[in-house]
């Protein structure tokens, strides 16, 4: 693999092959648009044309920090993994919601039912979020892969940066001052339980486990009131990794604020509370008056004593000092001025960003109206779409089917229709609806004999269920993918399809963006002539594209009439086919079937870096169980960490070290943020 470093760029691109097909033209076009100052561009890239690789080349050549937005965690994880492969020496970060489970605070007036906020925070994703903001503030070579979590409020970047602890060998500082600063940054003192976001004191030595670090801790050795040396070490084994001259410890939460800001916020909250009490008194609503006073005074007491309280995010406007209705600080405020934004699958992601605010606002309004929260809680919210537009840096929309918004805003459209592999868009066949079920049956049998897979998309849940039952009774190995299936199980089903555990997958609207299944040679669209969201020309092109990764790809549209959407989808697919066929003929390319390994089962070996210290685990192969995506990995890591800590308490240090290496192994293989 060639490693390429462009002039004036901090990125090192690990290039498995040079750009080919339409990629060189697309890369040059996007770079020219960026240098010309175009605010918006569109990369119209067909399925399998290597859009992610094009993005990586644009980032590497421009030398600018980048944020890539995806519309769900699964796609974000896929992009994150690919970017880690292209930029293993740079800071590729993952910024998604850190909740494994989240029940927001809500009130149902009709039943007089108040639902307390309940959530389970995923520690590993929280660490990755903190790592993302730290690297945005300290490095130039940063690529953030994010979901819409990026438009939700987090702490103010200015306040966050003021709360850091910077230490340097030779500095004069008292031990008690270091401890006081760490406590103000919400680090816990844990002399017995040394974990992420904590510190311990042993004589003149302070060990700090930074909140954003996945596996390194900092040892501050003092001599009187002078910092004698700084070392990075393994928090489990205690083995030293390297000596550092200086280090910056960042706060353990995005919501940490200086003491004077907390006191200022408390005064502002008191003033708003007084106004709200007067309002409910005038309205003669004593229950709401007592409720808001009791709840807010309790929170104020916690803020005075501890510096934070449960639900502190509802007071974010008072902490940031913003006026009513002003946008909250978000990840977008942490981005440097020269950043680039890529919005992947923009025809879905842009719409999703636009819809986040309204759902949040209606829930908050009830809490305010009935005295559970102060009116300022409404400003703890995601960005409105027009606010998001104001903070968007130079943006590239990436989609095979750009929507109306992209078409209206694109300064230029760069096409990436030709695939380097030579694969041609699927041949489209239109057949009558009357015999669709039996006709499809014979097509399925043909594919099964060739060892290929089939995707079938229907219009309704009932139709999908009946079709699945019918084919199952006829001996076809068929599964049904529907909206009730969670992300983990969905990934498992797709993996099983690729492995050949079944041959046909039936779905409704789940067989579109982000499904990378080279084994699928037939996509069947039932009732293709029923105009609507599921049969719009964009939906049809996306669904047809699922067969574009197979050399024998065919799409059958069952319809009794040709609708405008069908005509647009067929014409666009034919245009792309002709362009690819012409390219193949000119360059003597014979389309080759993509042979993509099913990577979901990890069986790897962890090799500790050659540092002269520690031991090499190369000969001790560690087999990891079936891990399909980030959720599986996180569960496995949590289980292994519990076992590792128990082994350490039982003084079984060798066993603990093996478990530690398993955890690292999972992180490295799934590219989860091992540093």
Curated annotation (Swiss-Prot):
GO terms for cellular component: cytoplasm; excinuclease repair complex. ATP binds at residues 45-52. A motif (Beta-hairpin) lies at residues 98-121. The keyword ATP-binding applies. InterPro entries: Helicase/UvrB_N (IPR006935), Helicase_ATP-bd (IPR014001), Helicase_C-like (IPR001650), P-loop_NTPase (IPR027417), UVR_dom (IPR001943), UVR_dom_sf (IPR036876), UvrB (IPR004807), UvrB_inter (IPR041471). Keywords: ATP-binding, Cytoplasm, DNA damage, DNA excision, DNA repair, Excision nuclease, Nucleotide-binding, SOS response. One of its GO terms (biological process) is SOS response. The keyword DNA damage applies. Pfam families: Helicase_C (PF00271), ResIII (PF04851), UVR (PF02151), UvrB (PF12344), UvrB_inter (PF17757). Residues 634-669 form the UVR domain. Residues 32-417 form the Helicase ATP-binding domain. Transmembrane segments: none annotated. It is found in: Cytoplasm. Forms a heterotetramer with UvrA during the search for lesions. Interacts with UvrC in an incision complex. The beta-hairpin motif is involved in DNA binding. The UvrABC repair system catalyzes the recognition and processing of DNA lesions. A damage recognition complex composed of 2 UvrA and 2 UvrB subunits scans DNA for abnormalities. Upon binding of the UvrA(2)B(2) complex to a putative damaged site, the DNA wraps around one UvrB monomer. DNA wrap is dependent on ATP binding by UvrB and probably causes local melting of the DNA helix, facilitating insertion of UvrB beta-hairpin between the DNA strands. Then UvrB probes one DNA strand for the presence of a lesion. NCBIfam families: PRK05298.1, uvrb. Belongs to the UvrB family. This is UvrABC system protein B. It comes from Neisseria gonorrhoeae.
């Amino acid at each position: 693999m060639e490693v390429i470093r462009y002039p004036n760029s901090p990125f090192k691109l690990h290039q498995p092959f040079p750009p080919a097909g339409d990629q060189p033209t697309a890369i040059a076009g996007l770079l020219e648009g960026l240098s010309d100052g175009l605010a918006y561009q569109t990369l119209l890239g067909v399925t399998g044309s290597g859009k992610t690789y094009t993005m990586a080349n644009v980032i590497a050549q421009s030398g600018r920090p980048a944020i890539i937005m995806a519309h769900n965690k699964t796609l974000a994880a896929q992009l994150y993994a690919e970017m880690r492969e292209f930029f293993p020496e740079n800071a590729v970060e993952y910024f998604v919601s850190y909740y494994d489970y989240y029940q927001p605070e809500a009130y149902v007036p009709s039943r007089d039912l108040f639902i307390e906020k309940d959530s389970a925070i995923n520690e590993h994703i929280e660490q990755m979020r903190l790592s993302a903001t730290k690297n945005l503030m300290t490095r130039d070579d940063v690529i953030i892969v994010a979901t819409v979590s990026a438009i939700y409020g987090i702490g103010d970047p200015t306040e966050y940066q003021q709360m850091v602890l910077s230490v340097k060998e030779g500095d004069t500082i008292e031990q008690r001052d270091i401890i006081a600063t760490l406590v103000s940054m919400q680090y816990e003192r844990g002399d017995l339980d040394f974990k992420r976001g904590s510190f311990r004191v042993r004589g003149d030595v302070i060990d700090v486990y930074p909140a954003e670090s996945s596996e390194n801790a900092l040892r501050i050795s003092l001599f009187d009131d002078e910092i004698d040396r700084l070392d990075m070490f393994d928090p489990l084994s205690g083995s030293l990794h390297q000596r550092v001259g200086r280090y910056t410890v960042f706060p353990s939460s995005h919501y940490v604020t200086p003491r004077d800001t907390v006191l200022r916020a408390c005064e502002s909250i008191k003033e708003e509370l007084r106004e709200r009490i007067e309002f409910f008194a005038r309205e003669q609503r004593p229950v709401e008056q007592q409720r808001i006073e009791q709840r807010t005074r309790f929170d104020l007491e916690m803020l005075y004593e501890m510096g934070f309280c449960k639900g502190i995010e509802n007071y974010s406007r008072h902490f940031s000092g913003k006026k009513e209705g002003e946008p909250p600080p978000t990840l977008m405020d942490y981005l440097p001025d020269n950043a680039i934004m890529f919005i992947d699958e923009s025809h879905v992601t842009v719409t999703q960003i636009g819809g986040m605010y309204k759902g949040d606002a209606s829930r908050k309004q009830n809490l305010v109206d009935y005295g559970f929260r102060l009116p300022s809680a409404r400003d703890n919210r995601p960005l409105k779409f027009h606010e998001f537009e104001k903070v968007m840096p130079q943006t590239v929309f990436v989609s095979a089917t750009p929507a109306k918004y992209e078409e209206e805003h694109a300064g230029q459209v760069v096409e990436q229709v030709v695939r380097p592999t030579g694969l041609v868009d699927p041949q489209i066949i239109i057949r009558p609806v009357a015999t669709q079920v039996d006709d499809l049956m014979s097509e399925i049998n043909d594919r099964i004999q060739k060892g290929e897979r089939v995707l079938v998309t229907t219009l309704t849940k009932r139709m999908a269920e009946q079709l699945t039952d019918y084919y199952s009774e006829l001996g076809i190995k068929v599964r049904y993918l529907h909206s009730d299936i969670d992300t983990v199980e969905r990934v498992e089903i797709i993996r099983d399809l690729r492995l050949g555990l079944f041959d046909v997958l039936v779905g409704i609207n789940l067989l579109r963006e982000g499904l990378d299944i080279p084994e699928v040679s037939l996509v069947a669209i039932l009732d293709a002539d029923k105009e609507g969201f599921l049969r719009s020309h964009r939906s049809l092109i996306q669904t047809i594209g699922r067969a574009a990764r197979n050399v024998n790809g065919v799409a059958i549209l069952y319809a009794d009439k040709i609708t405008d959407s069908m005509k647009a989808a067929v014409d666009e697919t034919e245009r792309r086919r002709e362009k690819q066929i012409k390219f193949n003929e000119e360059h003597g390319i014979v389309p080759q079937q993509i042979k993509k390994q099913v990577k979901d089962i990890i069986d790897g070996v962890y090799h500790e870096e050659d540092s002269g210290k520690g031991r090499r685990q190369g000969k001790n192969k560690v087999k990891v169980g079936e891990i399909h995506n980030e959720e599986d990995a996180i569960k496995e890591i949590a289980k292994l960490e519990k076992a590792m800590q128990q082994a350490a308490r039982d003084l079984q240090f060798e066993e603990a070290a093996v478990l530690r290496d398993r955890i690292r192994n999972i992180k490295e293989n799934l590219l989860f943020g091992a540093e």
